[in-house]
Amino acid sequence: MIFGGLFGGGREATRAQVAVVRDITIGRMVRLDALAWRRLAGGTFTLDRDTLEITAQGIIKLDDGGGYVHRFYTDDEMMLQAVSQQPDGSDADDFTLFRPWSSTYATGGWDDAAFRDRLSQPRWDEAGLPPFRRFWYDGDERVQPPVQLWEALYYERDGAPVKHIRQQCMLYVRDLAPEGQELLLALSARPEGGDTTHDIMIGLPLSPAEFSA
């Protein structure tokens, strides 16, 4: 399942070169099948184009052999994510397309603590969105801690990471007809030496046939 390995996280060591996953990397263009979102009834995810120009790339190494998360970004913060067991992404088989919904700066420690408390809940309610149930810990209605990750972000294929971002996050889901799902990724993100933001992203699972580079 999408994000199935995200139950822990560690900082990825500096890499000499970023991975190329299904021909996707910095500087490449990704083509999308718009039917992936248009065929779903009642979906919140919308996109007014069917191409993504990748200008940045992130990598997350999961703890305990959980694999790797590869993230490909556009200038307007669309994110295509792939999950793999191998660091080069050659065996990636879980793909999700995310678009930003909202992003706000934390106004203080109390604000960040309140947001982290929301990340622990089995249900996510957000203004302007239908309710989502927790995807991780599915069926468990107890309070659960957010997943913690370190993401190394690159702007150049052969360059060093430009920043490392600590994230506390939780993934939520709701069902759509016919036989589809929509995801909500809620995260508290803080770059080293930077300010904390609270971000909401709406996601759509993709099959390998629904995109190409």
Predicted regions and their residues:
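Mixed-charge, low-complexity intrinsically disordered regions
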Residues: 1-51, 57-213
